[in-house]
């Protein structure tokens, strides 16, 4: 009978360790989102009622009334993209289960945060792959996978997880555009910035890096038309 030996070095290569950290980080985020109610460690949730002025009310007004808040009071000043996606997720869950309880609908909205947090981890690994050695990528993924400030947002109702996703996406998109400044990458980057700015205004910060890369490559083919299309898509 052939003897089987477990080769630790062959199994736990640096690349496999990075993959393991990524999978572990995603499992942690999903587990936390499932077991933690939205009112625990939440931020600016307030009452689970359409008559309140917190993030829960923002979502519930979209689900129940089918429209954005009529004012910018308190948490109603937030950009709408995250809440539109969360309202869609909550409406789908309501349709599948028939449950119309406010707590259930608000908790269902966390699905967007959880998915965004997991995809943020993937995009972060892609960015680390661009700039770092495999050993440094391992350290970076360990920090991103298990530091509470990153995975807690995956179990909360709020735009933070989606904002981090778009920040990672636009930086990676800028890196890809610099390598291949074609129409496809220009339009994709513009869409990412447009959606990101509709999620949170702080997406303006990575724009400085993107502007620098654009300026470096201003002599590339058809630069002016690409920038015009980029502005038309991203700025509104």
Q: Regions from the language model: what does each represent?
A:
Residues 25-28, 140-145, 172, 193-197:
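Short helix- or helix-capping micro-motifs
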Residues 129-134, 170-186, 196:
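Membrane-interface transmembrane helices that cradle and orient dolichyl/undecaprenyl
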Residues 17-24, 187-192, 220-236:
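Hydrophobic alpha-helical membrane-interfacial segments at the cytosolic entry of transmembrane helices
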Residues 30-42, 46-77, 81, 89-97:
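Extracytosolic helix-loop segments that constitute the early lumenal/periplasmic catalytic or substrate-binding loops
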Residues 96-103, 124-146, 164-165:
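Transmembrane-helix signature of polytopic, membrane-embedded enzymes
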Residues 149-163:
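Short acidic/glycine- and proline-prone juxtamembrane loop motifs at membrane-interface regions
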Residues 103, 107-131, 169:
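Transmembrane-helix motifs of polytopic, lipid-linked glycan transferases
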Residues 4, 179, 206-234:
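Perimembrane helix-loop-helix junctions
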